């Protein structure tokens, strides 16, 4: 979601200031499969200019996807099976792991299929379903980062009232609110783009059905959907970042008000995992934004697409590792769970 903000702005400038036909020729190259009606399917190019490296990319993405699935599944299972881990922080982490699974599974299997076998075809409905779930997952994740920041604020600034403020009902309400907010924000965008007339090329210069890449194929002016995405993304991400920043300002103020250095370090260490996850979410998005802003003359198109591809898999791969390494209790619970599964199965087998 956050990486759409400047991309949409760039697309708006292109369509308002430059002849649209020229833009289409620059972005899409020679004409492909021109039809006069909505195509039954789209063709995903993959990473243009890196076709010779597609096999190695498929191997790397497959490895990261397996790590992401295993890591996030273990976290969800370990937290779900341990009643002592049903605290707000662990519940939000469980939801984050589930969102990461949805994000990676929406994109990576098809991407690997394109890179390995060249199976680039994706049906019209599947393409927009993929786009919906990718944007939905990113919108939910930014909301989760906000709720986790609020959790850290209450834990550090109001520790005596922690369980009274973050009750199970409050946690459920917050989780439902960020999910409903994401659905309300993303559904109109998906509807607007899917109802654009696609009477020209059906070749998507991307590895998955990304909003901007699809909007460029439309015969009608895609500015309304791009403007909606720009305003919606700005409001959602901007407000989330503002509240996260406010939470951490209050957290730092409370931490540095402690007299003991040991207490200060202990308090800050409880925020380390959350800060790491935020960095994985926002920094790759910023890199993708700046790459789009600089344009193909500075950042080649294949680099822009590669950055967008990595953005959907790297956070899902590294988030479980960050929380597993930084959270001692969770690490011990995961290790205990793995030993239980491995040794109990081996004992049953013998």
Curated annotation (Swiss-Prot):
Chief localisation class: membrane
UniProtKB keywords: Cell membrane, Disulfide bond, G-protein coupled receptor, Glycoprotein, Membrane, Olfaction, Receptor, Sensory transduction, Transducer, Transmembrane, Transmembrane helix
Glycosylation sites: 33
GO terms for MF: G protein-coupled receptor activity; olfactory receptor activity
KW Iron-sulfur (keyword) present: no
Positions in the Cytoplasmic compartment: 77-84, 151-169, 248-267, 326-350
Gene Ontology CC: plasma membrane
Pfam families for the chain: 7tm_4
Transmembrane parts of this sequence: 56-76, 85-105, 130-150, 170-190, 227-247, 268-288, 305-325
Domain of life, per lineage: Eukaryota
S-S bonds: 127-219
Membrane topology: Multi-pass membrane protein
Record-stated family: Belongs to the G-protein coupled receptor 1 family.
Described purpose of this protein according to its UniProt entry: Odorant receptor.
Name listed for the protein in its UniProt record: Olfactory receptor 52I2
Species whose genome carries this gene: Homo sapiens
